[in-house]
Amino acid sequence: MALGLAAKKEIVAEVSEVASQALSVAVAEYRGMEVSELTELRVKAREQGVYLKVVRNTLAKRALSETKFSDLESALTGPLIYGFSIEAPGGAARLFKDFAKTNAKLNVTALSIGSGLLGPEKLDAVAALPTRDEALARLLATFKAPVGKFVQTVNEIPSKFVRVLAAIKETK
Protein backbone atom coordinates (compact mmCIF):
# COMPACT_ATOMS: atom_id res chain seq x y z
CA MET A 1 0.00 0.00 0.00
CA ALA A 2 1.42 3.35 -1.05
CA LEU A 3 1.76 6.07 1.54
CA GLY A 4 0.18 9.44 0.95
CA LEU A 5 2.09 12.68 1.33
CA ALA A 6 0.55 13.39 4.74
CA ALA A 7 1.55 9.95 6.06
CA LYS A 8 5.08 10.41 4.76
CA LYS A 9 5.35 13.79 6.49
CA GLU A 10 4.16 12.23 9.75
CA ILE A 11 6.78 9.49 9.51
CA VAL A 12 9.54 12.00 8.76
CA ALA A 13 8.45 14.19 11.68
CA GLU A 14 8.28 11.21 14.06
CA VAL A 15 11.70 9.84 13.11
CA SER A 16 13.22 13.32 13.17
CA GLU A 17 11.86 13.95 16.67
CA VAL A 18 13.17 10.62 17.98
CA ALA A 19 16.56 11.21 16.31
CA SER A 20 16.87 14.64 17.92
CA GLN A 21 16.47 13.03 21.37
CA ALA A 22 18.61 9.96 20.65
CA LEU A 23 22.15 9.50 21.93
CA SER A 24 23.17 7.17 19.10
CA VAL A 25 21.79 5.33 16.07
CA ALA A 26 22.54 1.85 14.79
CA VAL A 27 21.41 0.78 11.33
CA ALA A 28 21.10 -2.89 10.39
CA GLU A 29 20.05 -4.79 7.30
CA TYR A 30 17.34 -7.33 8.05
CA ARG A 31 17.10 -9.05 4.65
CA GLY A 32 15.71 -12.60 4.97
CA MET A 33 14.45 -12.29 8.54
CA GLU A 34 11.04 -13.68 9.39
CA VAL A 35 8.30 -11.66 11.05
CA SER A 36 8.61 -13.67 14.28
CA GLU A 37 12.32 -12.80 14.47
CA LEU A 38 11.62 -9.10 13.94
CA THR A 39 8.91 -9.25 16.60
CA GLU A 40 11.38 -10.82 19.02
CA LEU A 41 13.87 -8.03 18.23
CA ARG A 42 11.20 -5.39 18.87
CA VAL A 43 10.31 -6.95 22.25
CA LYS A 44 13.96 -6.90 23.31
CA ALA A 45 14.27 -3.31 22.09
CA ARG A 46 11.33 -2.19 24.24
CA GLU A 47 12.89 -3.88 27.28
CA GLN A 48 16.19 -2.05 26.71
CA GLY A 49 14.75 1.38 25.92
CA VAL A 50 15.68 1.33 22.23
CA TYR A 51 13.33 2.81 19.62
CA LEU A 52 13.19 0.60 16.51
CA LYS A 53 11.70 1.69 13.22
CA VAL A 54 11.61 0.31 9.69
CA VAL A 55 11.40 3.29 7.34
CA ARG A 56 11.96 3.81 3.64
CA ASN A 57 15.48 5.08 3.13
CA THR A 58 14.36 8.24 1.33
CA LEU A 59 12.15 9.17 4.29
CA ALA A 60 14.95 8.33 6.72
CA LYS A 61 17.35 10.59 4.80
CA ARG A 62 14.88 13.46 5.07
CA ALA A 63 14.30 12.80 8.77
CA LEU A 64 17.99 12.55 9.64
CA SER A 65 19.15 15.46 7.45
CA GLU A 66 18.45 18.10 10.11
CA THR A 67 19.83 16.09 13.06
CA LYS A 68 23.28 15.25 14.37
CA PHE A 69 23.02 11.92 12.50
CA SER A 70 22.96 13.44 9.00
CA ASP A 71 26.26 11.67 8.29
CA LEU A 72 24.35 8.36 8.01
CA GLU A 73 22.77 9.36 4.67
CA SER A 74 25.52 7.75 2.60
CA ALA A 75 25.02 4.36 4.29
CA LEU A 76 21.25 4.07 3.80
CA THR A 77 20.81 1.39 1.15
CA GLY A 78 18.81 -1.83 1.23
CA PRO A 79 16.14 -2.98 3.68
CA LEU A 80 17.18 -1.33 6.94
CA ILE A 81 15.94 -1.20 10.49
CA TYR A 82 16.92 1.82 12.56
CA GLY A 83 17.67 1.56 16.27
CA PHE A 84 17.72 4.82 18.23
CA SER A 85 19.33 4.70 21.68
CA ILE A 86 17.33 6.96 23.94
CA GLU A 87 18.60 5.98 27.41
CA ALA A 88 22.18 4.76 26.89
CA PRO A 89 24.62 5.61 24.07
CA GLY A 90 25.42 1.96 23.37
CA GLY A 91 21.87 0.63 23.73
CA ALA A 92 21.00 0.04 20.07
CA ALA A 93 24.46 -1.29 19.23
CA ARG A 94 24.30 -3.66 22.21
CA LEU A 95 20.81 -4.82 21.15
CA PHE A 96 21.87 -5.51 17.54
CA LYS A 97 25.11 -7.18 18.64
CA ASP A 98 23.35 -9.53 21.06
CA PHE A 99 20.55 -10.33 18.61
CA ALA A 100 23.00 -10.99 15.76
CA LYS A 101 24.64 -13.73 17.85
CA THR A 102 21.50 -15.85 17.48
CA ASN A 103 20.37 -14.54 14.09
CA ALA A 104 22.97 -14.25 11.35
CA LYS A 105 20.54 -12.49 8.99
CA LEU A 106 20.77 -9.24 10.95
CA ASN A 107 23.83 -7.34 9.69
CA VAL A 108 24.80 -4.00 11.19
CA THR A 109 25.76 -1.65 8.36
CA ALA A 110 26.39 1.69 10.09
CA LEU A 111 26.53 3.41 13.47
CA SER A 112 26.63 7.00 14.61
CA ILE A 113 27.04 8.59 18.00
CA GLY A 114 26.61 12.05 16.56
CA SER A 115 30.25 12.63 15.73
CA GLY A 116 30.53 10.94 12.37
CA LEU A 117 29.72 7.77 10.51
CA LEU A 118 31.08 4.59 12.08
CA GLY A 119 31.33 1.31 10.24
CA PRO A 120 30.18 -2.09 11.47
CA GLU A 121 33.69 -2.83 12.74
CA LYS A 122 33.08 -0.30 15.54
CA LEU A 123 30.02 -2.21 16.80
CA ASP A 124 31.87 -3.75 19.75
CA ALA A 125 33.29 -0.40 20.84
CA VAL A 126 29.93 1.37 20.72
CA ALA A 127 28.16 -1.57 22.40
CA ALA A 128 30.70 -1.39 25.23
CA LEU A 129 29.80 2.21 26.06
CA PRO A 130 28.52 2.33 29.64
CA THR A 131 25.00 3.26 30.61
CA ARG A 132 24.47 6.41 32.65
CA ASP A 133 24.34 4.43 35.90
CA GLU A 134 27.53 2.51 35.05
CA ALA A 135 29.35 5.73 34.18
CA LEU A 136 28.27 7.36 37.45
CA ALA A 137 29.37 4.28 39.40
CA ARG A 138 32.82 4.40 37.76
CA LEU A 139 33.09 8.12 38.48
CA LEU A 140 32.16 7.66 42.14
CA ALA A 141 34.65 4.79 42.46
CA THR A 142 37.34 7.09 41.06
CA PHE A 143 36.46 9.76 43.61
CA LYS A 144 36.30 7.25 46.46
CA ALA A 145 39.62 5.47 45.81
CA PRO A 146 42.02 8.20 47.05
CA VAL A 147 40.01 8.75 50.22
CA GLY A 148 39.97 5.02 50.92
CA LYS A 149 43.72 4.75 50.40
CA PHE A 150 44.29 7.72 52.73
CA VAL A 151 42.17 6.16 55.48
CA GLN A 152 43.97 2.85 55.01
CA THR A 153 47.36 4.58 55.30
CA VAL A 154 46.37 6.53 58.42
CA ASN A 155 45.02 3.34 60.00
CA GLU A 156 48.24 1.47 59.22
CA ILE A 157 50.39 3.58 61.60
CA PRO A 158 48.72 2.45 64.86
CA SER A 159 48.37 -1.10 63.51
CA LYS A 160 52.08 -1.28 62.78
CA PHE A 161 52.87 0.06 66.26
CA VAL A 162 50.70 -2.64 67.86
CA ARG A 163 52.40 -5.35 65.77
CA VAL A 164 55.84 -4.09 66.85
CA LEU A 165 54.77 -4.18 70.52
CA ALA A 166 53.40 -7.70 70.07
CA ALA A 167 56.69 -8.82 68.49
CA ILE A 168 58.68 -7.30 71.38
CA LYS A 169 56.42 -9.02 73.90
CA GLU A 170 56.93 -12.38 72.18
CA THR A 171 60.72 -12.02 72.25
CA LYS A 172 60.78 -11.37 76.03
From Swiss-Prot:
Keyword terms of this UniProt record: Ribonucleoprotein, Ribosomal protein, RNA-binding, rRNA-binding
Pfam family, one: Ribosomal_L10
Key word RNA-binding present: yes
Family per record: Belongs to the universal ribosomal protein uL10 family.
Name of the protein in its database record: Large ribosomal subunit protein uL10
InterPro entries: Ribosomal_uL10, Ribosomal_uL10-like_sf, Ribosomal_uL10_bac, Ribosomal_uL10_bac_type
Subunit organization: Part of the ribosomal stalk of the 50S ribosomal subunit. The N-terminus interacts with L11 and the large rRNA to form the base of the stalk. The C-terminus forms an elongated spine to which L12 dimers bind in a sequential fashion forming a multimeric L10(L12)X complex.
Entry's Gene Ontology cellular component terms: ribonucleoprotein complex; ribosome
PANTHER family on file: 39S RIBOSOMAL PROTEIN L10, MITOCHONDRIAL
HAMAP family noted in UniProt: Ribosomal_uL10
An example Gene Ontology biological process: translation
Transmembrane region(s): none
Any GO MF annotation of the entry: large ribosomal subunit rRNA binding
Function: Forms part of the ribosomal stalk, playing a central role in the interaction of the ribosome with GTP-bound translation factors.
